[in-house]
Design a protein with these regions (language model features):
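Non-transmembrane, interaction-prone segments in cytosolic or luminal domains
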Residues: 1, 83-85, 169, 178
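Short N-terminal micro-motifs specific to bacterial/archaeal maturation
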Residues: 1-2, 64
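Alpha-helical scaffold elements lining the catalytic groove of polysaccharide deacetylases
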Residues: 157-179
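N-terminal export signals
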Residues: 2-4, 9-30
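Short coil/turn linker and secondary-structure boundary residues
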Residues: 5, 132, 170-173
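Secondary-structure junction/capping motif
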Residues: 6, 138, 174-177
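Active-site acidic carboxylates
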Residues: 31-165
Length: 179
């Protein structure tokens, strides 16, 4: 028996990296994290959307803030996005003087937590600095399907982990309005 999941509730995680956020039917995912074309293709229709989150060089092996095996999801994304009419990408896009970087917080080490005006903030190694190789999408990712790219984290005083709002949970990125 196939169980449909609310579009808003399905997040498919891979190796600790929340990539991609799939707004569709879970029934098309096999148990091995591979798309199974023999199953119900209940996704990719009408207003379903695929949101590809931060598949950038700095988050892949060899980058400044790598996720182990983060690049392994790229073939899955490339296959999935062909089935959606609406594909959106998010892209971490920081200035070099971003407030979350360890280099801009004397006495703080990467992965420490500090208090910011909007709440707790993890201190990160510099990553995804705009117009650098690290901020670019991974070369294996076929970005031709992206209808829109939402850049986030470009305000130096606030970080952004969400494709929808900055970390203050008030400042929108624009994605909600597009959807």
């Amino acid at each position: 028996m196939k169980k449909n999941i609310s579009r808003r509730s399905l997040i498919k995680s891979f190796g600790g990296l929340s990539l991609p956020l799939m707004l569709g039917s879970k029934s098309s995912w096999g148990h091995d994290n591979k798309v199974d074309d023999t199953r119900d293709s209940n996704y990719g229709k009408d207003l379903d959307a695929l949101i590809v989150v931060d598949v950038q060089n700095d988050f892949c092996p060899g980058g400044s803030l790598p996720v182990a095996k983060g690049n392994k999801i790229i073939p899955i994304i490339n296959k999935l996005q062909k089935k959606f009419n609406y594909v959106f990408y998010t892209q971490d896009w920081h200035p070099k003087d971003h407030s979350s970087f360890s280099t801009n917080n004397p006495g703080q080490k990467a992965f420490n937590t500090i208090d910011m005006y909007y709440g707790k903030q993890v201190i990160w190694p510099p990553h995804c600095i705009f117009n650098t190789k690290g901020a670019e999408f991974h070369k294996g990712l076929d970005t031709t399907y992206a209808k829109t790219i939402i850049r986030k984290g470009y305000r130096k005083e606030i970080d952004s982990y969400s494709g929808f709002f900055e970390n203050d949970r008030k400042t929108p990125t624009g994605l909600k309005g597009i959807l």
